Amino acid sequence: MDTNKNNNNSSKEAKAYLPPAEDVILKFMNKRAYKGTFIDFGCNDGYFTFTSEKFFTNVIGVDLSIDTINELLRTRPESSDAKFIRSHNYTTALPDGSADVIFMFHILKKIPNVKQFVKEIKRLLKEDGELWILEIEKTEADLGLKASDDYFIPKEELITRLKDDELHFIEYIDINESYYGVKFTKNEDLFMRFY
């Protein structure tokens, strides 16, 4: 079964309600200057990957599908320096502490073992790194998707599933009526110095 094809179709439907990638990234940045390495985990068609190059020095797209990665390499803009790697189940070949920001768009519901996945996220984040998660808000319109309730993940459930002694919830990001963002960090004390 080609789950990537199903994921691509639902992603295309959902993106019809999504603001431009640059607007989403700026909302997560919240007037704070970022640099360093941005990892787009579950990069799919590169919607956020390529746009993030405006704000970060190094950009890496990660996806399970080698076909997706090959397509991104074939079609990426000439000006792009983004790198792409394939993840294997819950791991990547990236070194420990390589990410200033890890970004994910609507992939948590597709991950069977969230704890194992979070372990890899924590390994990849720098000590002051941040995890940015963009999810679909269940609304009356449901974004026009023919989706069951398990397509959506409520904010509270997302926070409960991810936060632990090493990953701390920072804030909600109001994207629009159809999407919400959530920020986590490994080091709450370091993060608070910037605010």
Regions found by a protein language model. Give the residues of each.
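C-terminal lobe and adjacent flexible extensions of AdoMet/dcAdoMet transferase-like proteins
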Residues: 183-195
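A short acidic, Gly/Pro-enriched loop at the edge of an enzyme's catalytic core
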Residues: 90-102
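A short SAM/SAH-binding and catalytic strip from SAM-dependent methyltransferases
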Residues: 100-113
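C-terminal alpha-helical "lid/dimerization" subdomain adjacent to the S-adenosyl-L-methionine
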Residues: 4-5, 9-18, 130-183
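A short glycine-rich, Lys/Arg-flanked "PGG" loop and its adjoining helix->strand segment in the class I
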Residues: 115-130
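Conserved alpha-helix/loop element of class I SAM-dependent methyltransferases that forms part
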Residues: 17-36
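Class I SAM-dependent methyltransferase SAM/SAH-binding core
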Residues: 39, 44-91
